[in-house]
From Swiss-Prot:
Cross-referenced InterPro entries: bZIP, bZIP_sf, CREB1-like_pKID, Leuzip_CREB
Record SUPFAM superfamilies: Leucine zipper domain
Disease implication from the record: Angiomatoid fibrous histiocytoma: A distinct variant of malignant fibrous histiocytoma that typically occurs in children and adolescents and is manifest by nodular subcutaneous growth. Characteristic microscopic features include lobulated sheets of histiocyte-like cells intimately associated with areas of hemorrhage and cystic pseudovascular spaces, as well as a striking cuffing of inflammatory cells, mimicking a lymph node metastasis.
Recorded superkingdom: Eukaryota
Name this polypeptide is given: Cyclic AMP-dependent transcription factor ATF-1
CDD domains: bZIP_CREB1
Cellular component aspect of the GO annotation: ATF1-ATF4 transcription factor complex; ATF4-CREB1 transcription factor complex; chromatin; nucleoplasm; nucleus; RNA polymerase II transcription regulator complex
Residue span(s) of domain bZIP: 213-271
Taxon lineage: Eukaryota, Metazoa, Chordata, Craniata, Vertebrata
Site description Breakpoint for translocation to form chimeric EWSR1/ATF1 protein, residues in chain: 110
Organism expressing this protein natively: Homo sapiens (Human)
Assembly: Binds DNA as a dimer. Interacts with HIPK2 and CDK3. Interacts with MOTS-c, a peptide produced by the mitochondrially encoded 12S rRNA MT-RNR1; the interaction occurs in the nucleus following metabolic stress.
Any single GO BP term: protein-containing complex assembly
Molecular functions per Gene Ontology: DNA-binding transcription activator activity, RNA polymerase II-specific; DNA-binding transcription factor activity; DNA-binding transcription factor activity, RNA polymerase II-specific; identical protein binding; protein-containing complex binding; RNA polymerase II cis-regulatory region sequence-specific DNA binding; RNA polymerase II transcription regulatory region sequence-specific DNA binding
Length: 271
């Protein structure tokens, strides 16, 4: 009986080593579970932080609407700048151009106005005197071409500009009249864009020749021209004489040589 009771007690009584081992295993299991929970919480926090960071980056990026708005504002600003530049260029082109003034070889001044009028003036002691205006009118409002001007000389020696289709006629009184030559229009003819009013009387300022001072100046001018022509003819005559003298000298030399040869021949024959 005692033996059986000991065996049962030995079987039912707990062993101290197994209890310690079970407690250690449970402690390790708790540590593993706590580590897994901490890792899961860290992973969840990392995922939340990365999602928040991506959301912040997307929030900081400009939207397509904002980009389109910026581009449209820059386009309107560029158009405004172009409009201002065009306004400035239009203001610059609307400035008036000064009237050009030309001077001929005789000292006469010619001014071409913007409306096509020719203003003729001769220089004087007190400035420009004797202003004459020649009105130029367009024969066709839609035709455009080139106007050809030519010189015409008045009775007092002044030169004026008239179109190429004008004829200048001097009357017995000394006045100058210009007449226009009109041509029948055809398909091959050039358009006549500038026409001078016909007839236009150009009265000379110094038509009277009774002034003794003017007569004296004319006489002196003619004398100077005659003296210049006389000197030119004298120079030509002297040059011609010099050439003739040179030719005669050459002939004289040849004759002297022939004479010497004849003398030698005669002396030889006489011996």
């Amino acid at each position: 009986m005692e033996d059986s009771h000991k065996s049962t007690t030995s079987e039912t009584a707990p062993q101290p080593g197994s209890a310690v081992q079970g407690a250690h295993i449970s402690h390790i299991a708790q540590q593993v579970s706590s580590l897994s929970e901490s890792e899961e919480s860290q992973d969840s926090s990392d995922s939340i932080g990365s999602s928040q960071k991506a959301h912040g980056i997307l929030a900081r990026r400009p939207s397509y609407r904002k980009i389109l708005k910026d581009l449209s504002s820059e386009d309107t600003r560029g158009r405004k700048g172009d409009g201002e530049n065009s306004g400035v260029s239009a203001a610059v082109t609307s400035m008036s151009v000064p009237t050009p003034i030309y001077q001929t070889s005789s000292g006469q001044y010619i001014a071409i106005a913007p409306n096509g009028a020719l203003q003729l003036a001769s220089p004087g002691t007190d400035g420009v005197q004797g202003l004459q205006t020649l009105t130029m009118t367009n024969s066709g409002s839609t035709q455009q071409g080139t106007t050809i001007l030519q010189y015409a000389q008045t009775s007092d020696g002044q030169q004026i500009l008239v179109p190429s289709n004008q004829v200048v006629v001097q009357t017995a009184s000394g006045d100058m009249q210009t007449y226009q030559i009109r041509t029948t229009p055809s398909a091959t003819s050039l358009p006549q864009t500038v026409v001078m009013t016909s007839p236009v009387t150009l009265t000379s300022q110094t038509t009277k020749t009774d002034d003794p001072q003017l007569k004296r100046e004319i006489r002196l001018m003619k004398n100077r021209e005659a003296a210049r022509e006389c000197r030119r003819k004298k120079k030509e005559y002297v040059k011609c004489l010099e050439n003739r003298v040179a030719v005669l000298e050459n002939q004289n030399k040849t004759l002297i040589e022939e004479l010497k040869t004849l003398k030698d021949l005669y002396s030889n024959k006489s011996v």
